[in-house]
């Protein structure tokens, strides 16, 4: 009797393929179950308030911008609007936007607080080393309008101007007070990637005589996103629209020209305007900024191929750092002693801490570019630690120990958004 070995092997091949498919299906079901749980946890948390987390008394604009999608979905839109408009009530005559505000009888941290006659129940402050407050506010308004459909908010009057006019003044503040003519980009103090701590001071949140001004990718990418958002929702005449289109076009050109290192396929950490505060004993150019790169991707500053390369580089850095997720802020980290603020040691806080607050946004970008396998891979460890810790935390050590504020709404917001985007693909 003659027979072919193929007939014997075929059932084994089919069994192997079936087993592989079952494993893949099981992993997918597991991820979706985790996502459903974390999404509900995020909604439950964000129904409870608007502060950044249990460790903060303030409503911070950079945080609010990252959970306003959820807040506008699960909370009364009139309440969300009130908290958003309060930032405009604190806007300064030069157009600048504060970081956060807190009930006037509840201040506890040593910020230089200031008051607003339009919101006497609060006091506010601004971390002047950072240059993302104005951009964050415009992005937050954009998200609020998209979810609620409340375009009328732009015509509301605050301090004698419409909200739209005040938002435009915020952008003009950046072009007037934070713009470097040589490079055609905006500047801030030297910080670690997207951070708000400069190295020259034991706290490091305010510009001073020791500040080293620098241009970085995070601030400029945030501004690009903000202008594009403004162009989407604002009612403008032809001349006004052309002006802002030219501004954003110039920013994008100059970002690629001066900040993008084509050979290394990464963004330069800083362009210094009055020298570097760091020792020349290490090469800062080797540092890869995860957060700033993520925001650059959101600003459409990288090609699809470069997005994939960026993700692979982030995962490579995670392995080298023995970290837990691509929320790793940067790698390699700044050495011991680089920052006078002792909380900024290696793998601590913004110097190599692991922040879902930014890693979750990279997941969203992977989804947007169609890299769904990579998005799920990146998302899984972020969901796992939320479930394990029974809540949301500000940041994590490389070995996944939660640090900083609990009930951190920024983490909840970006995970909620990524989960919604991922399962909208089906």
Q: Where are the predicted features?
A:
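Bacterial Sec-dependent N-terminal signal peptides
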Residues: 1-26
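Catalytic cores of carbohydrate-active enzymes
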Residues: 23-43, 59-60, 97-100, 175, ...
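Solvent-exposed loop and edge beta-strand segments that line ligand/cofactor-binding
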Residues: 24, 47-66, 72-74, 119-132, ...
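Short, surface-exposed loop/turn segments at secondary-structure junctions
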Residues: 54, 153-157, 238-245
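Aromatic-rich carbohydrate-recognition surfaces in CAZymes
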Residues: 58-85, 90-186, 217-221, 353-363, ...
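Amphipathic alpha-helical segments within well-ordered protein domains
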Residues: 68, 228-231, 297, 363-367
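Short, flexible helix-coil linker/hinge segments at the edges of structured domains or between repeats
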Residues: 182-210, 269
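Long, repeat-rich segments with strong aromatic
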Residues: 250-254, 300-308, 317, 321, ...
């Amino acid at each position: 009797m003659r027979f072919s070995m193929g007939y014997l092997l075929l059932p084994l091949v089919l069994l192997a393929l079936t087993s592989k498919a079952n494993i893949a299906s099981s992993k997918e079901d597991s991820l979706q179950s985790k996502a459903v749980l974390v999404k509900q946890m995020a909604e439950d948390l964000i129904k409870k308030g608007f502060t950044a987390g249990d460790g903060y008394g303030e409503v911070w604009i950079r945080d609010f911008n990252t959970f306003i999608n959820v807040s506008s979905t699960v909370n009364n839109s009139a309440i969300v609007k009130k908290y958003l408009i309060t930032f405009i009530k604190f806007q300064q005559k030069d157009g600048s936007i504060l970081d956060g505000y807190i009930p006037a009888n509840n201040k506890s941290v040593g910020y230089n607080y200031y008051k607003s006659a339009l919101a006497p129940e609060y006091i506010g402050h601004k971390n002047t080393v950072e240059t993302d407050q104005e951009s964050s506010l415009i992005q937050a308004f954009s998200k609020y309008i998209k979810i609620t459909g409340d375009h009328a908010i732009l015509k509301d009057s605050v301090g004698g101007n419409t909200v739209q006019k005040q938002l435009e003044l915020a952008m003009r503040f950046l072009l007037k007070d934070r713009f470097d003519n040589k490079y055609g980009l905006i500047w801030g103090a030297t910080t670690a990637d997207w951070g708000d701590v400069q190295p020259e001071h034991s706290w490091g949140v305010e510009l001073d005589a020791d500040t080293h001004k620098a241009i970085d990718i995070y601030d400029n990418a945030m501004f690009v996103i903000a202008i594009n958002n403004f162009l989407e929702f604002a009612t403008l005449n032809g001349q006004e629209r052309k002006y802002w289109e030219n501004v954003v076009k110039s920013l994008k050109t100059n970002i690629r020209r001066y900040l993008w290192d084509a050979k290394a396929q990464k963004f330069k950490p800083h362009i210094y305007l009055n020298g570097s505060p760091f020792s020349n004993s290490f090469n800062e150019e080797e540092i890869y900024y995860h957060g700033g790169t993520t925001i650059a991707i959101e600003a459409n500053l990288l090609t699809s191929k470069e997005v994939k390369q960026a993700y692979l580089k982030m995962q490579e850095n995670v392995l080298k750092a023995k970290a837990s997720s691509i929320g790793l802020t940067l790698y390699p980290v700044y050495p011991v002693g680089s920052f006078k603020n002792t909380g900024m040691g290696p793998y601590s806080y913004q110097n190599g801490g692991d922040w879902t607050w930014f890693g979750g946004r990279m997941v969203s970008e992977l989804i947007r570019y169609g890299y769904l396998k990579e998005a799920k891979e990146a998302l899984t460890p972020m969901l796992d630690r939320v479930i394990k810790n029974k809540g949301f935390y500000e940041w994590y050590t490389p070995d996944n120990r939660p640090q900083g504020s609990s009930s951190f709404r920024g983490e909840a917001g970006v995970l909620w958004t990524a989960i919604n985007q991922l399962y909208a693909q089906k």
